[in-house]
């Protein structure tokens, strides 16, 4: 059938994607610390360079960030997204939720409140809280308001800057593996699809 022929072509095309591999640090592909990585097949390029009148920088972090992180509150994690991650339970090898959750979203939890400064040099509760007239966090006023970590700068200076140069991955090797797994599953070969999914989970958490 045409559907079968199409799926066979899909498998063939994905088998021809070579020379790529999964990146261990998932978040590095979305914060400018690992542009055009070995997992990236195609990504939208940005740059802070203004040579010869060029303007390839963006304000993506302002659109992504919550107001607590000096953003515009335009693109926020939904309750559905957070629930989808958490309903699996704390099953990661770290003893926490899926590691990709912590690399994708800032939210109120022990991980972001352990004194390691994972939220721009401080704890989550010192960003998402009320402040006194001297701009000091008021103890006991913290709240949970998830904010995307993906497509946000890695450090305070980057957060403070009104512009950023974070590339946007449009196709990654992980996407290729997932598409191949989907086709294999639809063909009735879940035993071949599962190892592809596990390969991603083993690397990305």
Which positions does each model-derived feature cover?
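Extended, hydrophobic/aromatic-rich amphipathic alpha-helical segments that build helical scaffolds
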Residues: 1, 5-8, 12-17, 42, ...
């Amino acid at each position: 059938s045409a559907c079968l022929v199409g799926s066979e072509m899909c498998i063939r095309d994905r088998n021809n994607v070579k020379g790529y591999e999964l990146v261990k640090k998932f978040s590095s592909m979305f914060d400018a610390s690992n542009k055009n990585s070995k997992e990236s097949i195609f990504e939208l390029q940005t740059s802070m360079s203004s040579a010869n009148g060029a303007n390839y920088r963006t304000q993506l972090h302002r659109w992504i960030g919550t107001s607590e992180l000096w953003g515009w509150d335009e693109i926020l994690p939904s309750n559905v997204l957070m629930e989808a991650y958490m309903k699996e339970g704390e099953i990661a090898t770290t003893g926490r939720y899926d590691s990709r959750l912590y690399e994708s979203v800032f939210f109120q939890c022990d991980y972001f409140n352990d004194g390691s400064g994972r939220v721009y040099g401080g704890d989550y509760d010192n960003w998402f809280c009320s402040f006194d007239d001297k701009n000091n966090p008021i103890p006991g006023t913290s709240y949970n308001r998830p904010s995307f970590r993906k497509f946000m700068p890695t450090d305070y200076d980057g957060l403070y800057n009104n512009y950023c140069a974070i590339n946007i991955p449009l196709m990654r090797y992980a996407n290729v593996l997932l598409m191949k797994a989907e086709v294999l599953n639809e063909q009735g070969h879940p035993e071949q699809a599962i190892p592809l999914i596990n390969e991603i989970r083993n690397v990305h958490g």
